[in-house]
Curated annotation (Swiss-Prot):
Organism from which the protein derives: Buchnera aphidicola subsp. Acyrthosiphon pisum (strain APS) (Acyrthosiphon pisum symbiotic bacterium)
Pathway info: Amino-acid biosynthesis; L-serine biosynthesis; L-serine from 3-phospho-D-glycerate: step 2/3; Cofactor biosynthesis; pyridoxine 5'-phosphate biosynthesis; pyridoxine 5'-phosphate from D-erythrose 4-phosphate: step 3/5
Residues involved in pyridoxal 5'-phosphate binding: 76-77, 102, 153, 173, 196, 238-239
Family indicated by similarity: Belongs to the class-V pyridoxal-phosphate-dependent aminotransferase family. SerC subfamily.
Record protein name field: Phosphoserine aminotransferase
Length: 361
C-alpha cells in the first residue's frame, strides 16, 4: 500500500508505532484475554495504566507537584464553560485575548456566565498579519483570570511568548500546541487540551491545573465540570473514555522514546521551515502571516489562482496527501504538521507543490 499522509487539523495523525502497538494489544491487553475497552476503569490494571500515563506526561512537561493533572471529557468546548464556572470566584469579569476563531469562541461562551472583556491583538502590516506582544495586552486589574489560545488552528497564527502576569490567573487553550515544544508550566495556572491533535484520539481532554485554584466553583457548576469533584475522584467521577486514555498514554511513551519535547520541538521547526520556505520562494503560493507568528502546527496557504483549489486537492489526494483543504472561514489550504507527521510527509507535500506549480503555474 502506498504511504498516506494525513494533514487533518483534528482528529489528526497518530504515530504509526502507537497504532501498531494498539493493534497488537487490541484483543488481549496485559494477557487479560480482553481489550482495554472491555475492562473496568476501576480495575488494578487500568488504574496502573492511568498512573503511568500521568507520570509520563509529568515527565514530558516537567509538571511540579503543585499541579494536578486531570483526564476529562467534553473537549475544549466543554472547558469554555468549565473555566468561568470554576475560576470566577465571585468576580464578574475575565480577560479573553482574541487572536482568532477559537479564542473568540471561548469568549462567546464565557458571556453566559460573566461579563468578559475581549482584547483583540491582531494587526495587519501591509499584507501580513501580526499579533501584539504580551506587554501591549490591555489587561484589566479586576479580571478573575486571563484566557488565551497560543495556537489558532484555523488562521495559522501562534503566540510563542510565555505569559508573565503578576497576581493573575493565566489560562491557556493548548489543544493544538501541547507537547509540540517545551514550555515552563510554572508560567500558567491552568492549561487544557483536547487530545485529538497532539495527544491521541478524540474523546479525552487533559487539564493541568495549579492546586491552589481548585475548589472555588460556582453553585451552578455541573459535577462533571467541577474541577474539585474531578480531582477528588481521580478523574473517575464517571466512567472515563478508557481507550482514549490508554492510547494517549502510548503517545506519551512514544514521545519520550523520540527524545522528549526538545527533540520534538526541533523536528517540528524543521518540518514547518521546509514548507514555509517552499511557499515563500514561490509566486504561486501565498502565506499571509508575519514570520514571527506563523504556526508550526498549522500551515495555512493559498493558491494565487483560487480556481485551481479543487484540482490541487484532487491531485494531492491521488498522491496520498490527504485533508489539505483549509477551513471554510479562511479558505485555501491548511497542512497540519502535528507531532505524528513525519518529515517525509512534509517532503512529499513540498515535492507535490513544486510539481503542481510547474504544471499549472
Amino acid at each position: 500500500m502506498n504511504l498516506i499522509y494525513n494533514f487533518s487539523a483534528g482528529p489528526a495523525m497518530i504515530p504509526r508505532d502507537v497504532l501498531n502497538q494498539a493493534k497488537k494489544e487490541l484483543h488481549n491487553w496485559k494477557n487479560l484475554g480482553s481489550s482495554i475497552m472491555e475492562i473496568s476503569h476501576r480495575s488494578e490494571e487500568f488504574i496502573q495504566m492511568a498512573l503511568e500515563a500521568e507520570k509520563d506526561l509529568r515527565d514530558l512537561l516537567k509538571i511540579p507537584d503543585s499541579f494536578k493533572v486531570l483526564f476529562c471529557q467534553g473537549g475544549a468546548r466543554g472547558q469554555f464553560s468549565a473555566i468561568p464556572m470554576n475560576l470566577l470566584n465571585n468576580l464578574q469579569t475575565a480577560d479573553y485575548i482574541n487572536s482568532g476563531y477559537w479564542s473568540n469562541s471561548a469568549f462567546m461562551e464565557a458571556k453566559k456566565y460573566c461579563t468578559p472583556r475581549s482584547i483583540f491583538i491582531r494587526e495587519t502590516n501591509g499584507v501580513k498579519e501580526s499579533l501584539l506582544p504580551m506587554h501591549k495586552w490591555n489587561i484589566n486589574e479586576n479580571s478573575a483570570y486571563i484566557h488565551y489560545c497560543p495556537n489558532e488552528t484555523i488562521d495559522g497564527l501562534s503566540i510563542y511568548e510565555e505569559p508573565v502576569f503578576e497576581n493573575k490567573i493565566v489560562v491557556g487553550d493548548f489543544s493544538s500546541f501541547i507537547l509540540s515544544r517545551s514550555i515552563n508550566i510554572k508560567n500558567y495556572d491552568l492549561i487544557y487540551a483536547g487530545a485529538q491533535k497532539n495527544i491521541g484520539p478524540a474523546g479525552i481532554t487533559i487539564i493541568i491545573i495549579r492546586k491552589n485554584i481548585i475548589g472555588y466553583s460556582s453553585k451552578m457548576t455541573p459535577s462533571i465540570l467541577d474541577y474539585k469533584k474531578i480531582s477528588d475522584h481521580h478523574s473517575m467521577f464517571n466512567t472515563p473514555p478508557t481507550f482514549a486514555w490508554y492510547l494517549s498514554g502510548l503517545v506519551f511513551k512514544w514521545l519520550k522514546k523520540q527524545g522528549g519535547l526538545k527533540a520534538i520541538e526541533k523536528l517540528n521547526k524543521k518540518k514547518s521551515d521546509l514548507l514555509y520556505k517552499k511557499i515563500d520562494n514561490s509566486d504561486f503560493y501565498i502565506n499571509k502571516i508575519n514570520s514571527k507568528h506563523r504556526s508550526q502546527m498549522n500551515v495555512v496557504f493559498h493558491l494565487v489562482n483560487p480556481k485551481l483549489n479543487y484540482i490541487f486537492l484532487k491531485e494531492a489526494s491521488k498522491t496520498g496527501l490527504n485533508y489539505l483543504r483549509g477551513h471554510s472561514i479562511v479558505g485555501g489550504m491548511r497542512a497540519s504538521l502535528y507531532n505524528a507527521m513525519p518529515l517525509e510527509g512534509v517532503e512529499s507535500l513540498v515535492k507535490f507543490m513544486s510539481y503542481f506549480e510547474k504544471r499549472y503555474g
